[in-house]
C-alpha cells in the first residue's frame, strides 16, 4: 500500500522546522471565491503545524515563501508553493509548539493595494504585467490564441489591484491558473482551454467498494446537465459611427437536451466599439452563461488534480465519460496523525480531494466582476502640450487631468480625448466653445463607467475668476472669449439691472455680419456712431433716408458726390451755398438758372440783375466785344468711391476743361442791352 507524507518548508527556516498535522486547501480556476463564498484568489490552504521550537515569531514566517509537498512512496507527487498570508502561534506542549498558517499565491499581494489610475494605449497583458511587476511578481506567463487590441483608456478606479485584474480578465475572457515547481509558482494566463496544461498520465476510475490500488484514482463521479442561456445579443454605440448598431450575436452548441428559441440574453451597452471586440465579448459572455450546462463532480485521492489542469479519464463503465476533462475547482484534505511522533495518534496519513469538472473542449469563463461606478460628476482640469493654449482634435475633444490621478504629468498624455457637451449640436450647425488649457471642467461618465468620461460643464475657481467682479455685477450675463496667443477678448454681454438694461458687444478686431434677407433696426432714442478710420458702404439698389428734424454734416476734407443719372434737390425755404474760394458749375449741354423774382450776379461793386423789370448791368465799365478772355475754374476732380472690404478703388475721372466764363459774360451783357432772351428757356417764356 502506498505511503503518504506531508512536508512544509518556509524560506529562511530549516526544512525540518515544521511538521504538518493536517491541511485543508482549495484551488479554483480564475475565481474570486469558493463555492462556500470564502475568498480565494487562485488557491488557499489552511495548514496546522507543530514544531519543537517555541521561538518562531511572525516576522520569521509571514509574507515569506512557503511550500507544501505531498510525497507518495518517498517521491514528491505534488507541491503547492506560495506565500504565508497569516500565521498563528498556539499552545505550547511538552515537546511541541502548535502553529498554523495560511498559504496563498503571491498574486494575493495585489489584494492589499487599492488604487486609482489610468492606463492608456495598453492591452490587457501589458496592464497585467505592470500590476504584477510593481508587486515584485515576475513569475507569470501568457498563453493566448487571440490578439488583444490596446485599450485607448482603461481606468482602475477606487478598486484593489486584484479586483481590477479579475474584472479585466473576465471582460476579455482570460482565466488564470498556477504551475507549481520546486521553490516557485508561475501564474499562467490563458484564453482557451486548449492552452491549459494536461497531466501526463490518464487517471483511472475505481468505484468498487473496498477496492484497493497503489495508484491514485477517482472513486466517485457524477455528471450534471442543466438548461442555460442559448443565445447572447449585445449592442453598443460609438459617436464615430452614430448610425451603426454594433449588434453582435453568439449561439450556444450542444443544446439538444433543451429548448433554444426563447433563452436569449440581451445586454447593452456591450462595452465595445468595434465588431471584432464585439464578437469576442459576445462569445465570452455566452461561454460564461453556459459554463455550468455540462459539469461533473467527483472525489479522488489523486493529489495532482488541481484547478486549471486537464486529464484523461479511463476505465469508467460509461464510455462517454472516458474523455478529457478540465478541473475548475478542487478541495484538498490531508491529515498526518503521526506527525507528533510520541504524542501522535495511531491513524494513517490520509489525503483526499473533491473536485468540479467540465469537458475540456469547453472554455471556462470567470464570473464577470462589477465595474466600479462613479458616484457623480468629477472636477478635472483641461491640459495639453507645453506652450499651447487650446488643444483639441477634429471632434473638439480635449485632454483632462483628474485630481486623483497620481501618475499623470498634467499634460497631453494625461487622459484620452474627452468629448465636450455643447449647448446645441446639429449637422454643421449649433454651438462650439472648446475648453482651454487650465480651465476647470465638470466631467460626467456615461452609464457611470469610469472608462467613458464626457465633459458636461465648466466652472470658475479661485484662479480662474469671472469676467466681472461678483456679486457687484450679478445682473450681467456675459459671453466673453480670450484672444488666442495674445491679449484681448471678444464679448457679448447683457445688463439686466432695472433702468440700466444694456446689450454690449465688443470685437477685439473685426466684426463681420452677413444677413441674407432683411435687416430692420428700430432705435427709440439716440444713435451714436464713431469710426476712427474709414467707412465704406455699398448698396446694390436703392437708398432712402428720411430725417424729420435737422440733418447736419461736417466734412473736414474733400467730398465727392457722383450721381450717374439725375440729381434732384428740393429746398422748401432757403438754399445757401458758400465756398471759401471757388464755385465751378459745368453742364455738358446747357445750364438753366431760374428764379421766380430775381437773379443777381455780383462781383465787388459790379453786378448783373435780372428781374421782372428787366436786366440791370452795373459796373465801372461795361465791355462788349472789346477783347479779353473768359475766367477759368479748377473743374471737377472728385474720386470714385471705394467698395467695402478694401476692394480696389476705380481710377478717378479725367480732369475737365474749365468753362470760358468771359465769353458767356459778354453774351449776357449784349443780350441785356438789346432786350433779347439769353437762352432757350427765356425765349420760350417770352413767347
Where are these regions (language model features)?
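Short, basic/aromatic beta-hairpin or loop at an interaction surface
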Residues: 30-46, 275-292, 408-422
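Short alpha-helix capping/helix-loop boundary micro-motifs
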Residues: 46-56, 290-301, 424-430
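Extended, domain-scale alpha-helical bundle/helix-rich regions
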Residues: 92-93, 122-141, 146, 154-361
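Short, well-ordered loop/turn sites that connect or cap secondary structure elements
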Residues: 60-61, 305, 435
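Assembly/oligomerization scaffold segments
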Residues: 1-117, 171, 293
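Structural signature for extended repeat/solenoid scaffolds and their inter-repeat hinge/linker regions
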Residues: 171, 189-190, 260, 375-602, ...
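Acidic, low-complexity/disordered segments
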Residues: 307-309, 319-380, 456-462, 467-477, ...
